[in-house]
């Protein structure tokens, strides 16, 4: 990803009739993006901690963050920063949907599929409203020299999937067709989550801050959304996976390989490893 280009922050907070600049105008655009990102990271993490204590309080906190991002994005004069804040709405939306749709009413595989549909729609709505090309969010033509890296990340899913199983130890899923369940996991967790985080969010983040700051921030947001698994080790693991996938996405400019790898990790975690115990 690239550092901020051609998106100099417009004057924010200028008082009409006086020419006096607001305090925000003295902050470099890249630093302002970092401050905004860290603020929302903190709020999302706080909402996740509250969810662990009481799901009703947690979902209320996520709803607050959702509306805060929507309102904040409309009040921000810098176009790139506004787009970044708008895309952050996807993080609380994911948790609102997952918390409000309990597993007791659906099998886990069906749950993954149902959750992914509104997330997929919301992500593409952001892409459309922001006028982003599909190639900018990872749907670009693979470059020949990047294919080894694109394909090389896929087999890493096997040890990573077993490693996450050792952390979480999920129960075996009820009987499902292995093929259909695998396809759902690849598309509904792999593709949708990679499009959301390494596609849209990473693209917007690296336009308002440096490449590495954007990668670290999105990896951290991805990690804190795993707080509900009640494992600090899993949050660290999720950060590592997110960081790894972000680097591959940055080098290859696509999300094909990491989407398959992400899906395979979940196939190992939920379908393969539990049956081997």
Name each model feature, range by range.
Residues 1-130, 274-277:
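N-terminal, membrane-interfacial amphipathic/helix-forming hydrophobic leader that caps
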Residues 134, 198, 202, 242-246:
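Interfacial helix-capping/hinge residues at the ends of transmembrane alpha-helices
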């Amino acid at each position: 990803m690239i550092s901020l280009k051609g998106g100099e922050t417009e004057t924010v907070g200028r008082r009409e009739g006086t020419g006096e600049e607001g305090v925000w105008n003295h902050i470099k655009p890249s630093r302002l993006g970092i401050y905004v990102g860290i603020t929302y990271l903190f709020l999302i993490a706080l909402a996740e901690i509250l969810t662990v204590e009481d799901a009703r309080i947690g979902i209320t906190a996520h709803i607050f963050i959702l509306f805060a991002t929507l309102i904040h994005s409309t009040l921000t004069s810098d176009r790139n920063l506004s787009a970044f804040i708008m895309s952050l709405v996807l993080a609380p939306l994911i948790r609102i949907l997952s918390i409000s749709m309990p597993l007791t009413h659906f099998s886990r595989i069906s749950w993954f599929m149902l959750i992914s549909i509104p997330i997929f729609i919301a992500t593409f709505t952001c892409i459309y409203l922001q006028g982003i090309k599909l190639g900018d969010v990872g749907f670009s033509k693979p470059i020949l020299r990047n294919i080894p890296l694109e394909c090389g990340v896929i087999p890493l899913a096997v040890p990573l999937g077993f490693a996450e199983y050792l952390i979480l130890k999920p129960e075996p899923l009820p009987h499902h067709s292995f093929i259909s369940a695998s396809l759902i996991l690849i598309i509904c967790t792999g593709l949708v989550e990679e499009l959301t985080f390494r596609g849209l969010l990473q693209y917007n983040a690296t336009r308002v801050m440096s490449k590495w700051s954007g990668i670290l921030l999105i990896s951290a947001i991805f990690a804190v959304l795993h707080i509900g698994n009640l494992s600090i080790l899993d949050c660290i693991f999720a950060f590592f996976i997110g960081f790894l996938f972000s680097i591959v996405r940055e080098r290859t400019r696509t999300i094909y390989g990491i989407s398959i790898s992400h899906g395979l990790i979940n196939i190992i975690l939920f379908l393969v490893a539990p049956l081997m115990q």
